[in-house]
């Protein structure tokens, strides 16, 4: 008998809690039994079910909005919290930026020049790409996705046929084509809080972006060295989990502005199943990482319980 992961999440909790209740009742019935028999009964049955209940108890995350879905099949929802709340998404935006760039089938070796127009005057975010820097479109895309380089992302959009206005229009058209009905973009970087979406919509965007091999590669690259204006610049991935040996991540993107909080979206294999994770509006430096690890443990524990139930 095959049991889906979603079904296991529901049945596992009920099974564990009901079994625990039965153990309590059985213990009461055997209250007058001999001490040796009573001790043996509790050791053999009750402890196993307590452990199973602990493994399948309800997941709790600290992020303001969250969604976990199975990738492929029916796309079952495994967990959700405020998943339809429309919120700013910060640099998660850059996944859409990358898709629009690649949809245009550009020459990835063509040079991209950083200009004064690419400097962030809204928030004053830092960048090591000085005005006048020239780098291949391929490298600009890598930096935009891996290290969330705002000047690189803005320059990519500015070099789009028709310029910035045409690029942002293409972003919104792409969003609508993916069924992202509660999503709106006004810039390619995510620095504006007017770039908004929901966890449900972003799951659709992650699913779409996962079809692009270059996006998968660049978002999961842990670090890179880039030659710019005679200097070697070292960049790191903004998601520390891509370097973890305990994670199998196929796509990743982080984001942060004050209005959006800390954000993280990922495609990953957990318990040998591909899933999409969306975490929005996280407070604190490590909250989104902590939530991701809690989700990972929860799914892995649930999968173990499911296997036990299937064998039974």
Which stretches of residues belong to each language-model region?
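N-terminal secretory targeting signals
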Residues: 1-65, 297, 301-312
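Hydrophobic alpha-helical segments, especially transmembrane helices
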Residues: 3, 7, 95, 268-270, ...
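Short, hinge-like loop/turn segments at secondary-structure boundaries
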Residues: 27, 130-131, 236, 295
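Active-site-adjacent loops and short helices of periplasmic peptidoglycan-processing enzymes
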Residues: 30-32, 38-200, 204-213, 270
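Domain-terminus/edge residues, biased toward the C-terminal soluble/receptor-binding domains
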Residues: 180-184, 193-312
């Amino acid at each position: 008998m095959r049991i889906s992961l979603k079904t296991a999440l529901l049945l596992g909790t009920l099974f564990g809690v009901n079994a625990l209740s039965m153990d309590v009742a059985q213990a009461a019935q055997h209250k007058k039994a001999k001490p040796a028999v009573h001790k043996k009964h509790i050791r053999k049955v009750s402890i196993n079910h307590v452990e199973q209940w602990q493994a399948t108890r309800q997941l709790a995350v600290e992020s303001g909005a969250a969604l976990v879905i199975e990738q492929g099949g029916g796309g079952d929802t495994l967990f959700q919290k405020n998943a339809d709340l429309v919120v700013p998404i910060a640099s998660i935006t850059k996944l859409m930026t990358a898709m629009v760039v690649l949809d245009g089938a550009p020459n990835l070796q063509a040079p991209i020049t950083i200009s004064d127009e690419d400097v962030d005057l809204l928030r004053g975010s830092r960048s090591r790409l000085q005005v006048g820097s020239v780098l291949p479109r391929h490298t600009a895309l890598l930096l935009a996705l891996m290290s969330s380089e705002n000047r690189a992302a803005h320059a990519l959009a500015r070099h789009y046929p028709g310029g910035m206005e045409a690029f942002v229009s293409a972003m919104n058209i792409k969003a609508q084509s993916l069924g992202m009905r509660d999503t709106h973009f006004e810039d390619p970087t995510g620095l504006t809080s007017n770039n908004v979406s929901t966890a449900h919509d972003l799951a659709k965007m992650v699913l779409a972006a996962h079809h692009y091999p270059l996006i998968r590669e660049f978002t999961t690259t842990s670090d890179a060295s880039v030659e710019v204006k005679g200097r070697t610049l070292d960049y790191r991935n903004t998601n520390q989990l891509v370097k973890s040996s305990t994670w199998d991540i196929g796509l990743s993107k982080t984001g942060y502005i004050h209005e959006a909080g800390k954000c993280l979206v990922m495609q990953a294999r957990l318990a040998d199943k591909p899933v999409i994770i969306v975490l929005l509006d996280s407070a604190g430096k490590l909250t989104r990482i902590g939530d991701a690890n809690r989700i990972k443990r929860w799914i892995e524990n649930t999968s173990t319980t499911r296997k036990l139930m299937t064998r039974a």
